[in-house]
A protein has these predicted regions:
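Short beta-strands and strand-loop turn motifs
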Residues: 122, 153-156, 187-191
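Structural recognition of alpha->loop->beta junctions
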Residues: 172-190, 230-243
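Hydrophobic, aromatic-enriched interface-forming segments
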Residues: 68-143
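A metal-dependent hydrolase metal-coordination microenvironment
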Residues: 1-96, 184, 190-234
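Short, structured patches in soluble enzyme cores that scaffold and shape functional sites
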Residues: 39-41, 108, 155
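Conserved, well-ordered alpha-helix/loop/beta-strand core segments that scaffold catalytic motifs
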Residues: 133-179
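Acidic-and-aromatic substrate-binding clefts and catalytic sites of carbohydrate-active enzymes
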Residues: 1, 129-133, 159-169, 192-200
């Protein structure tokens, strides 16, 4: 991809998504929640970042195996056929990017175990979940900044995703959390997102301007039904990266 970009004189920004574990003393009795962070414009040859991403990738596969083992326990109780190693390999063949529960859900639909992805989560994947590899906000920031990049808080108000909504639905409270506990490690905030409404976008833009943060946006297109390129993001967002 980078070679083709250079060959056709296309400007690009390197990017990676990192999942972190975050807790706040005022919410959920300090129980940690999962949040997504975005690293932009980093050196893809940075060895520390490469090493960590490899560890995360290897952990994801082990996590998937553990989730399937738990699902097998449930399937056995229901007198249904358990997943095999061949099933795991078949799921892996469908993965384009990071291996996660949505890929298992899709496979369960394909095998006729459930009628749709949501039922896969409701009946099996929530109950059989295994925690993701714990990475702190500080560690993620040091990795990305150490590679010359910028760390951005992904979709902070996504009602359906790994976001601050897990702590509070109030955007005002979300901004308070960011200001109190996250600002030293953040360079920006993702304002435009498929599940951010106009009011949410405006609130995040105002907050970012006040705190001197970069503003970014993305469709969060990991798979269907979300389509890449369907979100209208101003050109000045890319210009912030001095391309």
């Amino acid at each position: 991809m980078l070679f083709r970009s250079s060959a056709y004189d296309i400007k690009y920004i390197t990017g990676v998504e990192l999942n972190i574990s975050f807790s706040h003393p005022r919410y959920r009795n300090s129980k940690p929640v999962s949040l997504d962070m975005l690293g932009y414009q980093y050196d893809i040859h940075n060895q520390e970042l490469i090493k960590k991403l490899k560890q995360v990738s290897e952990y994801r596969r082990k996590r998937a195996e553990q989730i399937l083992e738990k699902i097998n326990d449930e399937l056995t109780k229901e007198h249904l056929k358990a997943f095999t190693h061949q099933d795991l390999e078949a799921i892996e063949e469908t993965v384009d990017g990071a291996f996660g529960r949505p890929h298992i859900a899709n496979y369960m639909v394909k095998k006729g175990i459930v009628s749709n992805k949501q039922k896969a989560f409701d009946k099996y994947l929530v109950k059989c979940n295994v925690p993701k590899m714990p990475v702190s906000l500080e560690e993620a920031s040091k990795l990305i900044r150490g590679a010359g990049g910028k760390l951005v808080h992904a979709h902070p108000s996504d009602p359906n995703g790994t976001s601050l909504v897990s702590l509070t639905p109030s955007i005002h409270e979300q901004h308070k959390i960011i200001k109190e506990s996250m600002l030293p490690w953040l360079d920006g905030i993702e304002c435009w997102h498929t599940r951010h409404n106009p009011e949410t976008i405006s609130a995040h833009l105002a907050f970012a301007k006040k705190e001197g943060l970069l503003v970014t946006g993305g469709s969060d297109c990991h798979q269907q039904p979300i389509i890449m390129g369907t979100l209208d993001i101003p050109a000045y967002v890319a210009e912030q990266f001095n391309l």
